[in-house]
């Protein structure tokens, strides 16, 4: 079982996995699952390799049992995947590992255009920043494409994957989020990570944090579906989805190095978000605007640019 020590002033806080409070499935279902809440189903399991992989497989094999807003969460995830397929693992009960199945349709029941799907991971990251800030007093920011940061340190990551439909219907999407909740200095997978505990959050109750996130995600997702997945349309009474994300994104305006999946890199200034959620960068060498849809992005200091 994972253990860690958190130093606060002259005190050390010691944690073992079993001392961290567990998720409470019945409490969560009572407040979140229909007809009371917005979820179709909520499954809480002790351990898995990856909630994203599991939920995508369930949705592919028995789609009728996994409608829109089906949720899978785990106390321990042993083979989670991040950007560019990187793996990471945290001690049991120290984080939120949650995946949500989305089958996006507009209010008339028409599927959203698949080109809008690129926004869903950004939307989920936005929902997470909003729910965490409202509950804990910690003010996270977004880093393109899928990181949630506090003062440059990674608090959470979001990853989306398509689930093909064998009957010819549009694919579903599984959006997964991993939020570092009570990780200590000793638990951190990398030195550039952080957790709500380390940021002195007003609460580290994962039941409350999970409920807040899923309720906020549902609100934002429904607003996105109501405008047919148009991220530039007036959205939720407060600008567009793109505007809301841009306001919280620290990448914009930065000089960045983007390592592309197929090799090669682009160095330039991050200008804006494209209509599909990609990152528009002005190449430093050629002065050409390029839209990057997938990359490992590093924010450069002036001396590195």
Regions found by a protein language model. Name each.
Residues 142-146:
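Alpha/beta catalytic cores of group-transfer enzymes, especially the acyltransferase/condensing modules
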Residues 7-21, 105-140, 150-305:
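Long, positively charged amphipathic alpha-helical accessory segments at protein N-termini or as interdomain linkers
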Residues 80, 147, 178:
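Active-site glycine-centered loops adjacent to acidic/histidine catalytic or metal-binding residues
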Residues 6-134, 302-305:
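N-terminal lobe of the biotin/lipoate ligase/transferase fold
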